[in-house]
Amino acid sequence: MAIANKNIIFVAGLGGIGLDTSREIVKSGPKNLVILDRIDNPTAIAELKAINPKVTVTFYPYDVTVPLAETTKLLKTIFAQLKTVDLLINGAGILDDHQIERTIAVNFTGTVNTTTAIMEFWDKRKGGPGGVVANICSVTGFNAIYQVPVYSASKAAALSFTNSLARLAPITGVTAYSINPGITRTPLVHRFNSWLDVEPRVGELLLEHPTQTTLECAQNFVKAIEANKNGAIWQLDLGQLIAVEWTKHWDSHI
C-alpha cells in the first residue's frame, strides 16, 4: 500500500518506535496522519507537521483502556472529519510485569477493542469499504522472554488475534498483519520490571546483546506498510525486515 494520499490512524504514534515511525510515515506523504495517544506532546506534533507541511497531522488524547463505546465515539468523530480511513496502526504497549492487569489491558485488550470499534466503520457486511490493520506485537510473541511472562503472553495474544483477523478478511473486508520488533533501544526497555522481581536486571541484560535503533525499526515498519501483505508476520530485528513463516501444529478444520 502506497502511503501517499492515504488516511492513517496511529495509536501510540508518539512513543519510542511510534514517533520515529510517524516521522517516516509523514515523509511518505499521507493525506492525514491522526495520532491517538495517552500523553500529548505538542513539540512532537509540531515537528511532524514541519517535516511535511502537505500532510495534515492531528492529535486526539486516547487511552486504549477506555470502554469500547468511548473508542467507537472517538472514531465516529474521526471518520466524520476524514470520511475514509485506510490504515489503523495499533501501537500501544507497556512493559512492566509488576502491573499485570494493566499490561493485559494495554497490550492486548486495548488492541482488540480499538480494532473492534473500527469494524463498525469498515466491515463490508455493514456496507463498509474494508481497511487495513497493522498491530505492533513483539518477537516475544514467538518465544517469550521468560522473566517477563505477562508481557510476553500479552504480545502472543495480540499476535494470535492479528493472525485471526487476517483469516477473517474474506468475511469482513479488513486485512491485517503484525509488526514484531526485536529488542529496540527505547525508554521501554530501560524500565523493564520482571514478574515477581525474578530478574531485577532483565533490561540491562537484554541491552548487553545486539539491538536495533528506533529509526531502523521505523524504516522497516514503513516497508512492511508498503508491502501490505495480509496475514504477514513481520519480524523487525537488528535492522532487518523478515517475513516469518508460521508453523502450524494444529488445525480446527472449520
Curated annotation (Swiss-Prot):
MF terms (GO), sorted A to Z: alcohol dehydrogenase (NAD+) activity
Gene Ontology biological process terms from the UniProt entry: alcohol metabolic process
Keyword tRNA-binding in record: no
Keyword check for Plastid: no
Keyword field: NAD, Oxidoreductase
Binding site for NAD(+): 10-33
GO cellular component: cytoplasm
Enzyme class: oxidoreductase
Residues where substrate binds: S138
InterPro entries listed in its UniProt record: ADH_Drosophila-type, NAD(P)-bd_dom_sf, Sc_DH/Rdtase_CS, SDR_fam
Enzyme nomenclature, EC number: 1.1.1.1
Pfam families: adh_short
Alphabetical list of SUPFAM superfamilies matching this protein: NAD(P)-binding Rossmann-fold domains
Catalytic activity: a primary alcohol + NAD(+) = an aldehyde + NADH + H(+); a secondary alcohol + NAD(+) = a ketone + NADH + H(+)
Active site residues per record: Y151
Oligomeric form and interacting partners: Homodimer.
Similarity field: Belongs to the short-chain dehydrogenases/reductases (SDR) family.
Protein name, entry field: Alcohol dehydrogenase
Protein species of origin: Drosophila borealis
